């Protein structure tokens, strides 16, 4: 008995998927509006296994299109479409006043419900925050071009959101890694157990390429701005709720979000410091400066705030009593003074820092150190890293807590080959010293990063210990020794060091090394028995591996062989790098930390540039080998004479280069040989 016949398009891929043209017709939207709605709702095209309408079409799931049909933004988009027709009609009739009035009455919409819909919990929003932060920081550096419909208000909003995020990272001490590349600065922060990574472009003049669809990027940015506002609001209020003073005195909660920018610092292009002065206080200010400048700040900050939320809250709260303001100023002054004294006496290896607590180690790494940033170094990335790791940042300009001549400055960040005037009471380092010290959780030696010297290789902190079997540079081994020494110092400072330690500078593995030494001492009683037992264990492991290989299925064996091939290729690559490093060390082209010396690099470049000229002068296409026999030319091509040796006979009877006696060792290259004619 035959089965029931099914109608075409009622089941399978034809019933589950729909083309983009069909979706646009069903929703009664323009293609640009449909694309915008899909971006805001998070609907992506699908790839069915069998495409019923053709291979060159874009498909969407039918359930997604039905879900879009119930979106409230559809009515708003249709209203905007009808309103645009009215504006165009008024402009066609040369009625400028009506067109201007209608353009000001364009329907608006909000995306708050979409954020709550796509991210049910706050942790979900943090997990999907990487692209949002990268896009916001990108548009914060772009110019407002009317040619590409990039409004100035959007750029200013991105700038404000980026600074608010950086200020929270500094205040909470959540920054963990930073890496400088050609694309920009990669930052990674740990917030509520979630790792958030974003990219900040270099502060250069941006040239907008014409082949980029900025409308699509602005649509993504529209949703990302709303998402980041939600996240910043939640993070700031969580930070405020953690402070006991905010629970006792609710007036402080008005300063949490949005933070108030200091007009003086904002005009001096120190936006991050301007926000930090409000949410955390300028820890690097002297007590006298805090008391003198905070006289009427509580009254002056309210009118200059651009946010309507802050003005409404301030109006509802009313003016604060003068006694209350005096108590607030006195409390801030005392807290700032206490922090100043304790920070100057602390540090990464100071007492009270638990080595197992990464947040405490990161927050106290630069404690008690004042960094003066030169005019040639990037201020914002360095200020973000320095303040997030407990340091104090100063610069040349208005609003700086310290001047360049201040004796409190311990480090000066410069990026010049030579420094004219130097202070003996401070260290002069390159910007890479700050990033490497923050990544490795240890203060690196300053002589390696002195001005005018080639710094060590900038190792990526995102690789970490995941590539233990791969190539390990020499500088990474040096960093590990420094980290072991720093961890041992922190253990001693915290009172957790084991008694009876030898007190050496570089403690290798700590307690694990002591336990291993005890095990070796116990096994040394019967060394021969231990060796026999070890050999038997190896044989047993080999036998088990062979048995497991026999019992594997064909698919599992193929996968296992692929894994072994990849591991072998990896080991071969490591051996190549090791041999290359050995050759560079033998020729003296590599420094002690693996960096290429400038002199050696210049000699290599000069030799490479002079090679074509020597070949042209000799009339051949090969180069004379120093102290070695030149290889035989292919297809009758001549070669220059080898130094001190006779060149081999040419193939097929064609011309060869006449060998001549080379000068003494250490002299110039051999004289070019004359080419014979047939």
From Swiss-Prot:
InterPro entries linked to this entry: BRCT_dom, BRCT_dom_sf, PES
GO cellular component: nucleolus; nucleoplasm; preribosome, large subunit precursor
UniProt protein name: Pescadillo homolog
Pfam families listed in its UniProt record: Pescadillo_N
Gene Ontology terms: biological process: maturation of 5.8S rRNA from tricistronic rRNA transcript (SSU-rRNA, 5.8S rRNA, LSU-rRNA); maturation of LSU-rRNA from tricistronic rRNA transcript (SSU-rRNA, 5.8S rRNA, LSU-rRNA)
Biased composition (Acidic residues): 283-303
Any GO molecular function: ribonucleoprotein complex binding
Biological role stated in the UniProt entry: Required for maturation of ribosomal RNAs and formation of the large ribosomal subunit.
Membrane spanning residue stretches: none
Chain intervals with Low complexity compositional bias: 597-618, 630-661
Region (Disordered): 283-316, 563-678
Source superkingdom: Eukaryota
Subcellular localization, as worded in the UniProt entry: Nucleus, Nucleolus; Nucleus, Nucleoplasm
Stored PROSITE patterns: BRCT
Assigned protein family: Belongs to the pescadillo family.
Coiled-coil stretches: 552-587
Compositional bias of kind Basic and acidic residues: 564-581, 662-672
């Amino acid at each position: 008995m035959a089965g029931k016949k099914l109608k075409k398009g009622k089941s399978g891929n034809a019933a589950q998927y729909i083309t983009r043209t069909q979706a646009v017709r069903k929703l009664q939207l323009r293609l640009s509006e449909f694309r915008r709605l899909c971006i805001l709702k998070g609907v992506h095209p699908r790839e069915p296994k069998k495409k019923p309408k053709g291979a060159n079409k874009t498909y969407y799931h039918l359930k997604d299109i039905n879900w879009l049909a119930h979106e409230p933004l559809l009515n708003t988009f249709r209203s905007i479409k009808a309103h645009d027709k009215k504006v165009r009609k008024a402009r066609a009739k040369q009625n400028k006043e009506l067109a201007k009035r209608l353009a000001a009455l364009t329907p608006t919409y909000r995306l708050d419900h979409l954020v709550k819909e796509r991210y049910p919990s706050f942790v979900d929003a943090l997990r999907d925050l990487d692209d949002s932060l990268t896009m916001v920081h990108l548009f914060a550096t772009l110019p407002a071009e009317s040619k590409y419909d990039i409004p100035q208000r959007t750029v200013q909003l991105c700038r404000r959101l980026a600074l608010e995020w950086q200020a929270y990272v500094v205040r909470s001490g959540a920054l963990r890694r930073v890496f400088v590349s050609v694309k920009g600065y990669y930052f990674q922060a740990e917030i509520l157990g979630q790792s958030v990574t974003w990219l900040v472009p270099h502060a250069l003049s941006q040239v907008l390429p014409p082949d980029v669809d900025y409308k699509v990027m602005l649509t993504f940015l529209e949703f990302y701005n709303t998402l980041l506002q939600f996240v910043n609001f939640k993070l700031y209020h969580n930070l405020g709720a953690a402070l006991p003073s905010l629970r006792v005195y609710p007036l402080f909660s008005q300063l949490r979000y949005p933070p108030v920018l200091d007009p003086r610092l904002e005009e001096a292009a120190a936006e991050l410091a301007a926000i930090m002065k409000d949410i955390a206080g300028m820890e690097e200010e002297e007590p006298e400066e805090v008391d003198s400048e905070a006289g009427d700040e509580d009254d002056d900050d309210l009118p200059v705030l651009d946010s309507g939320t802050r003005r409404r809250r301030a109006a509802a709260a009313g003016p604060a009593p003068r006694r209350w303001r005096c108590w607030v100023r006195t409390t801030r002054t005392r807290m700032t003074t206490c922090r100043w004294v304790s920070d100057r006496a602390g540090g990464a290896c100071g007492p009270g820092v638990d080595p197992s607590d990464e947040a405490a180690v990161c927050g106290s790494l630069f404690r008690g150190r004042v960094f003066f940033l030169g005019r040639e170094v990037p201020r914002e990335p360095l200020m973000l890293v320095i303040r997030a790791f407990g340091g104090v940042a100063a610069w040349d300009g208005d609003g700086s807590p310290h001047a360049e001549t201040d004796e409190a400055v311990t480090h000066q960040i410069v990026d010049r080959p030579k420094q004219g005037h130097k202070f003996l009471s401070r260290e002069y380092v390159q910007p890479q010293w700050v990033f490497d010290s923050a990544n490795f959780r240890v203060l690196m030696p300053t002589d390696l990063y002195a001005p005018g010297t080639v710094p060590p290789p900038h190792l990526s902190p995102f690789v970490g210990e995941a590539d233990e079997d791969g190539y390990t540079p020499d500088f990474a081994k040096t960093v590990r020794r420094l980290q072991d020494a720093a961890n041992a110092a922190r253990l001693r400072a915290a009172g957790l060091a084991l008694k009876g330690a030898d007190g050496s500078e570089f403690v290798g593995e700590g307690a694990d090394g002591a336990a291993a030494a005890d095990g070796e001492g116990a096994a040394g009683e019967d060394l021969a028995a231990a060796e026999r037992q070890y050999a038997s264990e190896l044989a047993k492991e080999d036998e088990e591996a062979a048995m497991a290989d026999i019992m594997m299925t064909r698919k599992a064996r193929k996968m296992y062989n692929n894994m072994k091939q990849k591991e072998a290729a990896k080991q071969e690559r490591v051996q190549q790098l090791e041999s290359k490093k050995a050759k560079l060390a033998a020729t003296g082209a590599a420094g002690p930390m693996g960096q290429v010396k400038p002199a050696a690099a210049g000699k290599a470049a000069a030799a490479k540039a002079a090679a074509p000229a020597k070949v042209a002068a000799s009339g051949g296409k090969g180069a004379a080998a120093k102290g070695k026999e030149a290889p035989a030319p292919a297809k009758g091509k001549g070669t220059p004479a080898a130094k001190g040796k006779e060149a081999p006979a040419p193939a097929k009877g064609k011309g060869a280069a006449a060998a001549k006696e080379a000068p003494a060792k250490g002299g110039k290259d051999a004289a070019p040989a004359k080419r014979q004619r047939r």
